[in-house]
Amino acid sequence: MASTPEAKVKKQIRKILEEMGAYYAMPIGTGYGNSGVPDFLVCSKGSFIGIEAKANAGKTTALQESHLSRIRGAGGTALVINEQNIDQLKGYLS
């Protein structure tokens, strides 16, 4: 299932979210959805968190940054998680 580097990051994120008891949904980017929405929409301990998963030194697109900025502007938290900072996610959710 986790064949690409980004898919491996997503698998690790899912595992952490499940371990921490967080609610999450993964919107599917289809013709009927909104492009640029974070990979994970999370509710943990009453807080809304948008998580964009990236592999290696992958950069967010302008559209993804726009969505992350809108989440922050609405009082939520927006994170970009990759292999280098994935351990910080568990600490953040604690």
Give the residues covered by each predicted segment.
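Catalytic phosphate/metal-binding cores of nucleic-acid and nucleotide-processing enzymes, i.e., regions
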Residues: 1-94
